[in-house]
């Protein structure tokens, strides 16, 4: 990826700003190569002070960029794409969408001309360079996919998937960050109930969750094989696990993911 490449983030809200922060933390982008665009531009003054380029003019942001990353709400994406379309150039621009629900084909229709397009679905852990980002792209070549992969590999891990799997990836990868955070919160509350201070309970829950994830990431084992290592006959761990399963722990997580996928499928249509 060229060291002079400029990125415009159209819709610099929570996820857009998380992407910007992650790219800068990677060391491969200085803030001056990233333009943040949103209507309520006054909310970006802290980022302007950090050296980011800030504007409320989407077309101007596109004209001074090489990669255009669209990160707006599904309900307004049609209008945004229509307005920036005249400034998009096939030979210069890579268009990356992190908008839930809108397909590459639909993006092409809204832009009204051929473009190299990739879809990406990161999560907010991108701000600390630990995102799980799923990517998919269209033809005529792999330039959009390659650029998306390079950008998002700087801020976590990427996984190329079929575009038809993007809604499922949204539910598990993007929404899922909240589910695991809620699990950490619940674990810390349990720690408080059995006598730990709130501060210590949260610290223990966070590091324990991190350790569990690392066991799977580094070792490549299945979760149940690691669970077997800490569940002894008549022990306290298996008692706790069985109690949580009786209360519907696994089924609640599974149902949450399926409901999120169902809702994600409706967001763009509802717009």
Task: Tell me what each language-model feature is.
Residues 121-126, 170-180:
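Glycine/serine-rich anion-binding loops at beta->alpha junctions
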Residues 34, 61, 197-205, 226, ...:
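Small-residue helix-packing motif on alpha-helices
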Residues 1-56, 60-64, 130, 192-194:
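NAD(P)+-binding Rossmann beta1-loop-alpha1 motif at the extreme N-terminus of oxidoreductases
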Residues 106, 110-116, 132-168, 179-220:
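Internal alpha-helical scaffold of NAD(P)-dependent oxidoreductase catalytic cores
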Residues 2-3, 206-271:
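NAD(P)-dependent Rossmann-like dehydrogenase/reductase catalytic/cofactor-binding core
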Residues 19, 41-43, 50, 58-135:
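Rossmann-like NAD(P)(H) cofactor-binding subdomain of soluble oxidoreductases
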Residues 30-33, 91-93, 116, 199:
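Short acidic capping loops at alpha-helix termini that bridge into adjacent secondary structure
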């Amino acid at each position: 990826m060229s060291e002079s490449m400029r990125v415009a983030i159209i819709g610099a809200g929570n996820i857009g700003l998380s992407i910007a922060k992650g790219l800068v933390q990677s060391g491969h982008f200085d803030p001056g190569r990233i333009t943040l665009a949103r209507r309520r531009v006054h909310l970006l003054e802290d980022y302007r002070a950090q050296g980011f380029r800030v504007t409320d003019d989407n077309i101007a942001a596109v004209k001074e960029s090489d990669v255009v990353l669209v990160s707006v709400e599904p309900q307004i994406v049609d209008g945004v794409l229509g307005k920036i379309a005249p400034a998009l150039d096939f030979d210069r621009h890579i268009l990356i969408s992190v908008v839930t629900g809108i397909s590459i084909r639909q993006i092409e229709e809204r832009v009204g001309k051929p473009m190299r397009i990739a879809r990406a679905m990161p999560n907010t852990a991108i701000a600390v360079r630990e995102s799980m980002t799923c990517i998919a792209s269209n033809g005529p070549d792999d330039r959009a996919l390659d650029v998306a992969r390079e950008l998002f590999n700087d801020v976590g891990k990427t996984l190329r998937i079929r575009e038809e799997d993007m809604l499922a990836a949204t539910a598990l990868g993007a929404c899922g960050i909240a589910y695991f955070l809620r699990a950490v919160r619940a674990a810390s509350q349990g720690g408080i109930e059995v006598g730990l201070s709130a501060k210590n309970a949260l610290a223990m829950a966070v590091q324990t969750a991190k350790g569990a994830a690392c066991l799977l990431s580094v070792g490549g084992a299945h979760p149940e094989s690691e669970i077997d290592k800490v569940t002894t006959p008549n022990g306290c761990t298996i008692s706790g696990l069985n109690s949580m399963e009786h209360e519907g722990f696994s089924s609640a997580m599974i149902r949450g993911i399926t409901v999120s996928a169902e809702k994600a499928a409706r967001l763009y249509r509802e717009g």
